[in-house]
Each structure stands twice: as C-alpha cells, then as structure tokens.
Amino acid sequence: MDYLRFVGDSTPAIRLERWTQADLSLLRATNTPEMTEHLGGPETESQILGRHRRYLELSDPSAGQMLAVAMPDGQRAGVIGYWERPWRDGLTYETGWSVLPVFQGQGVATAAARAVARLAGAQRRHGHLHAFPSVDHPASNAICRKAGFTLVGETHIEYPPGSVMRCNEWRLNL
C-alpha cells in the first residue's frame, strides 16, 4: 500500500495512507455522537456512503486528498485531508480531521495536521492551509495551535450544508 510516514519532534510516528474502499469502516467509526458533536451530529448511512465516494474520488493531490491516519502497527487512528475551497477573495486549502477516541490526547492529530500541511505545501498551489474548528471545540483549536497555525479570528462557515457554524479561522503559511 502506498503511504507516507511522518515522525515529529515530540509527536508520535504516524502514516498517512491513501483513502481506499476498506476505509468505509473507519468513516463509520468516526460517525458517532461523541465524534460529531461539533459538526452537526452523525450522518445517515446514505450520507456516509456519499462522503466515502467523494473521498475515493478526491485523487488529484493538487486539488486535495483524504487520507487515513495509521499508527506504525497499521491500526487506523483517524481521518485527515485537505481540499480546495473558496475563501475570502480566492481559493485556498482547508483541512479537517477526526481521530478515534482511543488515540486522542496522544499527539496523533497534531502529527497528522503537521503531516498534511507538508503534503498540501508540496503541491505549491496555494499559499495557505486553513482550519475552521468550532469555537466550542477546545481540543481541535489546541491542535491547530500546536501544529503551527495562526489564529486569524472568529468567523462563520456553512457546515454541515444548510447550517451556519461559529468557528475559529486558523491559517498556516505553506
């Protein structure tokens, strides 16, 4: 399997592996009330299947990609990716992640965020990577800070579609 391995200074070694058909079970594992509390709640099975299809189709790294976060022993720890989005007066990259509870609090999400920033930056397509965690989600905001993002300020984005979410805008220079 193709993968990229990253080791951070004090963060755990992780692998970012390309999204495959087998990762549908990982997507379902992240679709719990606890994991989606700050994202509008769990999705229906139909929505999960649609998301999985979109993740599989996002295969041009310059436009973005979704990746499984894997531990050195192969265990799936979560999901991360980056994709293009319109923002302010142009296009930029956005990132988002979800790490399973058993792997939370160990630096896995921070390592994954740093790794995905390197991947996005290697595309040399956009100058910034943005993250938009809910203002009410201290863990995701802390991950942004630890991964080197700069807090721009509070904003509102539409997520999930049809809902406006109050979030912090974090930006990382690529």
Go through the PLM ranges and name each one.
Residues 1-38, 66-174:
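Acyl-donor (CoA/ACP) binding surface of acyl/acetyltransferases
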Residues 49, 53-57, 100, 121:
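Solvent-exposed, non-membrane alpha-helical residues enriched in polar/charged side chains
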